[in-house]
Amino acid sequence: MPPRRDLKKILIIGSGPITIGQAAEFDYSGTQAVKALRGAGYRVVLVNSNPATIMTDPELAERTYIEPLDLEHLEGILAREAPDALLPTLGGQTGLNLAMALHEEGILQKYGVELIGAKAEAIRKGEDREAFQEAMQRIGLEVPRGQLVGSVEEGLHFAREVGFPVVVRPSFTLGGTGGGIAHDEAELVEVLSRGLTLSPVHTALVEESVLGWKEFELEVMRDHADTVVIITSIENVDPMGVHTGDSITVAPAQTLSDVEYQRMRDAAKAIIREIGVETGGSNIQFAVDPKTGRQVVIEMNPRVSRSSALASKATGFPIAKIAALLAVGYRLDELPNDITRKTPASFEPTIDYVVVKIPRFAFEKFRPLRNTLGELKDELTTQMKSVGEVMAIGRTFKEALMKALRGLERDVRALAGVRTEELEKKLYPNPDRVYAVMELLRRGMPVEELYQATRIDPWFLHQMKEVVEAEEWLKTHPPKDREDWRFYKGLGLTDRRIGELVGKGEKEVRAERKALGVVPVYKTVDTCAAEFEAYTPYHYSTYELEDEVWPSQKPKVVILGSGPIRIGQGVEFDYATVHAVWALKEAGYETIMVNSNPETVSTDYDTADRLYFEPLTLEDVLNIVEHEKPIGVIATLGGQTPLKLAKGLEEAGVRLLGTPFSAIHQAEDREAFHALCQRLGIPQPEGRVAQSPEEALRLAPEVGFPLLVRPSYVLGGRAMQVVRDEGELKRYLEEVYAPLEERPSILLDRFLEGAVELDVDALSDGQEVMVAGIMEHVERAGVHSGDSATLLPPVHVPEEALKKVRDYTRRLALALGVRGLLNVQYAVVGEEVYVLEANPRASRTVPFVSKAIGVPLAKLAALIAVGKTLKELGVRDLDPVPPYYAAKEVVIPWIKFPGVIPELGPEMRSTGESMGIDQDPYLAYYKAELGAGQRLPLSGRVRFIGEGLEDLKALYQEAGFALTEGEDYDLLISLVPDPELRRAVERGLPFITTREGAWWSLKAILRARESGLRVQSLQDWHQKAPRG
């Protein structure tokens, strides 16, 4: 069937700001789909409120709208653009829910827009829990017994029938939001009340528990001709009860018998046909009772999902790209496999390696010790809590597991010092469980006992035990020949770990291994187990004899990615590395990407010329550098992870491109930076560096309270706090500093109360400096810059202060010897400007500033790194200021951490961001708030909590708002961490926790009342901006 030519213009909805349960995988799938559809001759309109994405780059779609993802703005875009079709399956749950709302409200019909990829009925059947159960019964497949309920009473009635525990799954929510496991009636009342509130349709499925069963997923694709292919099977190492996004997973499935697998395949094909997903991908989840083999269907996602991103990276089969092309009428057998160029997409991938994914968590950012449910603070349940993930490829499960563990950037012996009885308490589902299991295996706990405690399949436990036994043997039998070395390295053991076991240093072990000629070989991900030649260079390392990767003779550059997403190091850094790859490719260099994150555009097989899917450790990166012999490595774009490798790479003789390591060190070394600022005559707040807690207590009175305290060398404000007296400082040192593994020095800074903070992104070639963007923080000093709303250009900073900011930024860039990007943070009091810190690397604001001014900063930085100047790159305006305002607001996943009361402080907690653009700064702010899910009411009741709020109350009353003390309000403003804030989170109501936020929000509300809704594409905004 030829592609549909009756469709000319297609609208794609993105997934909005990154949050837990919906991360960079949708940027990856959306980017792939836009490229595929434009390549097939379609015009593409994209809408997404998230500026930190590749998909919102103005070059990608024909028209790009960075607007809030709600019905009003979508209708405005439909009216303006008149697309023929809407593809809803690439924007995660957000995109799917929005498409359904547009359909149900009759808006799609009004504008004559067709839903493609998945019809409304298929989406309803796949997402509506009751409809899905009925569909499964029709085709004779078992599901756990369950009932769709609309009230707590109905839920209690059903639970009494089937017995506890029961699982609660709210309808149409993301990453299991609002769901959970209830072990008794009191817990059910709590979980179900929350779930019913958070479900957009206020229903939830209460079902019998299959806790402890094995969990499997199949990625399935279907075309118009009813060809169905299974892309891969995925097995969850953690049993049922842990959300699949929070579970360690492995592909292909390892413990299914062939008969069980065939049964599952047949079921998956029947399901995709019954639900009616005519084109595209679906993810179907099954549970298997390990005792009886009983197989039940858990759920399906009739869209591209987190698992499909993982399946794409695991197999090399581009699910999102193929799904987009199937949606416009192609058949699977008409689409070639990019990797082999010989086989069509209707050939199921075959893989001759094992892939392991491990999630990355951020519990340390959200700290109540117990929530009201009695869940332990880091317990994993059916509600997803991880913020990122790492993937590794090996020839065996053991090798892939050990590579993935080191990709998390944590010591595999993280729990070595913990007492056995404490370790036994860590066997409930939590992020440390895999470390506890391995440590207990080292101490001789039998596999059967561990199985009873964890329900992790004995096969996986035996695999871990084999690694542990090999480590034990190694202590007394150091490797003596190549075979020994290959055996130990083939288990995924690092040089450092081998060194610890045999009593040698990492460098010595590396030298011994290389002297024997034992180096990794690189294998290729080819979708066909080496049956056909592969044309796309996508590689992983292993310790075997045959190398499948031959380096070319072209000049090449290695770009280091940022590893798993975490709070403080998000998709913004992936954005910067992808732009660098594209720029260097255009400039004629062969680009080599090294990264371990399966969710991102950087690890797409067609982003760089070569992709090494490897952990970002010094050993792994040096192996690649020695294999490829590049002209140099770029380590300043991927955040703190590659930056930490810069010193080791330089010591090993690797050339760092761009800003030299000496500049990075000078900016991060407190005393060196202080001396530099004094020499340049740039004011800094009073500050000291202490090497121990005792010294910190002695120095604090010299600097004077209040103090901003933090450990040196951290990202995302980890362990940063404002302390107001000696008692608070002592508590900080005992509770926050003492548990840190590395015990760095302690920075004590005078805290400037009431100062306006500015964030500046600049670009330097060593001669000239472009001050690309100056951003004003809405929240005052003391709130981490990554958690503050920002405006570009600034609204409330005097011109005299801005002149100083530009001048100081130029002086710092040139004095540090920056060749590339520089981020500087300032505090402004009146016209006085103080520098807080400078980071000679890509910052998390680079995508936002690039979109705001219409200049691709990361691309320019990469070209400067290989010797170009700003003049040569055609940059004429060194102080670009757009003739409109761009606002950025952050998203913090409070809802995922029951019991946590929202509060902003110096430690970063946001996972994502939204952007608003308008001629008026307050309307830009209003749009950014809407984009972040904060629906500020234009009228209604406001409740205030806290002292000294009379001025704000008067302003809100003057604006026509009624004040209330009760629970029935439309907006909550609480300047103290009151439990009512938690209730607002759970009821989905807007809330504000800072005085500045309340003031800005009121101004924004007043402007939004006056002016109607305006939507405009990024391309149109950029027409107005002065070209750099």
Curated annotation (Swiss-Prot):
**Keywords for this protein:** Amino-acid biosynthesis, Arginine biosynthesis, ATP-binding, Ligase, Magnesium, Manganese, Metal-binding, Nucleotide-binding, Pyrimidine biosynthesis, Repeat
Record field: catalytic activity: hydrogencarbonate + L-glutamine + 2 ATP + H2O = carbamoyl phosphate + L-glutamate + 2 ADP + phosphate + 2 H(+)
Residues covered by region (Carbamoyl phosphate synthetic domain): 550-933
Transmembrane segments in this chain: where?
none
Q: How is the cofactor bound?
A: Binds 4 Mg(2+) or Mn(2+) ions per subunit.
Residues binding Mn(2+) 3: Q825, E837
| Keyword field contains Protease | no
**Region annotation (Carboxyphosphate synthetic domain) ranges:** 1-409
Give the UniProt record's GO annotations in the biological process aspect. Answer: 'de novo' UMP biosynthetic process; glutamine metabolic process; L-arginine biosynthetic process
Which cofactor(s) does the record list? Mg(2+); Mn(2+)
Q: In which pathway does it act?
A: Amino-acid biosynthesis; L-arginine biosynthesis; carbamoyl phosphate from bicarbonate: step 1/1; Pyrimidine metabolism; UMP biosynthesis via de novo pathway; (S)-dihydroorotate from bicarbonate: step 1/3
Residues reported to bind Mn(2+) 2: E299, N301
Task: Identify the residues that bind Mg(2+) 4.
Answer: E837, N839
Residues the record lists as binding Mn(2+) 4: E837, N839
Question: Which amino acids does the record list as binding ATP 1?
Answer: R129, R169, G175, G176, E208, V210, E215, G241, V242, H243, Q285, E299
EC number per UniProt:
6.3.4.16, 6.3.5.5
| Residue ranges occupied by any ATP-grasp domain in the UniProt entry | 133-328, 674-866
Residues noted as binding Mg(2+) 1 in the record, renumbered to the chain: Q285, E299
Domains (record comment): The large subunit is composed of 2 ATP-grasp domains that are involved in binding the 2 ATP molecules needed for carbamoyl phosphate synthesis. The N-terminal ATP-grasp domain (referred to as the carboxyphosphate synthetic component) catalyzes the ATP-dependent phosphorylation of hydrogencarbonate to carboxyphosphate and the subsequent nucleophilic attack by ammonia to form a carbamate intermediate.
The cross-references to PANTHER family, in alphabetical order and at most eight, read: CARBAMOYL-PHOSPHATE SYNTHASE [AMMONIA], MITOCHONDRIAL (PTHR11405:SF53), CARBAMOYLTRANSFERASE FAMILY MEMBER (PTHR11405)
The name on file for this protein is Carbamoyl phosphate synthase large chain
